[in-house]
């Protein structure tokens, strides 16, 4: 993974005769956790061999975006969230994080310098409302396509196999594939093609992921410093835990929570939250083991 200063020194293996795709996963990552990483891994594994994907990019939302869109009493700084993604050794060297000021523009310039064709794919989960059928909506000029993966947040009403098996969808998967892949073009109200939407899914057998950033914060509210030090649960689930431990915003937030920790509702919630997080972590490990 690259820091913003390393991006010009370490580059992916580009192809001269193919379009080189970079998968961009934008999100709050407040904080980043193993569920985010597994979603990225699963998407890269099953995107399809016809897409020459040379790398992937974690793109944390800005602090201002989080403050205006998320109702949270903890907003970790963009620099902290990026450093956490950069630090964790479970994130492969082919996955980068986006600097806040430059975004993917830095990577576009890199491609131009190497004289190769690079395109960007936006990675979304099934819980995201893409608004693609609202033809008055805007398609981001930075992206040639959207890869929507139902892994982890699947529901029976989300992109069912029967609905994907009809026009205007094209079937891309082959016999023996671990997932189903379908694709259709997206147009504006004038009929101009904006890009493609590809869905990868296991249908009714889709795997479930229960780990969430809000769940991490809820558990962190009810355990004290000694309990947190003795437990490996959050250390295993959160990406870049050692960076989070020394973050000033996190420390101040934790101090406020410790002041309230002895309230009856906190004590009652502790056991339930710990069990829920342990169950979610075991499920996440089974998901990875099955691949």
Regions flagged by a language model, labelled:
Residues 1-291:
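Nucleotidyltransferase catalytic core that binds NTPs
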């Amino acid at each position: 993974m690259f820091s913003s200063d390393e991006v010009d020194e370490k580059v992916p293996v580009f192809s001269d005769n193919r379009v080189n795709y970079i998968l961009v996963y934008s999100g709050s990552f407040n904080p980043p956790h193993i569920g985010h990483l597994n979603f990225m891994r699963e998407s890269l594994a099953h995107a399809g061999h016809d897409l020459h994907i040379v790398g992937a990019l974690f793109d944390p939302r800005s602090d201002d975006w989080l403050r205006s869109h998320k109702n949270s009493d903890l907003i970790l700084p963009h620099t902290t969230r990026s450093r956490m993604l950069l630090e964790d050794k479970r994130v492969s060297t082919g996955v980068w994080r986006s600097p806040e000021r430059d975004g993917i523009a830095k990577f576009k310039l890199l491609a131009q310098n190497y004289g190769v064709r690079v395109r960007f794919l936006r990675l979304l989960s099934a819980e995201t409302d893409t608004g693609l059928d609202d033809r008055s909506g805007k398609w981001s000029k930075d992206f040639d396509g959207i890869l929507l993966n139902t892994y982890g947040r699947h529901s029976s009403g989300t992109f069912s196999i029967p609905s994907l098996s009809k026009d205007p969808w094209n079937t891309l998967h082959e016999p023996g594939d671990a997932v189903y892949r379908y694709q259709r073009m997206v147009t504006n109200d004038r009929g101009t093609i904006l890009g493609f939407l590809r869905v990868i899914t296991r249908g009714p057998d889709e795997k479930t992921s229960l780990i969430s950033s809000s769940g991490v914060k809820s558990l962190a509210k009810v355990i004290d410093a000694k309990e947190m030090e003795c437990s490996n649960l959050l250390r295993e689930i959160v990406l870049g835990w050692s960076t989070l431990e020394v973050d000033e915003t996190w420390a101040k937030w934790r101090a406020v929570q410790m002041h309230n920790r002895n309230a009856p509702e906190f004590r009652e919630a502790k056991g339930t939250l710990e069990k829920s997080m342990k169950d979610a972590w075991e499920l996440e490990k089974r998901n990875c083991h099955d691949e």
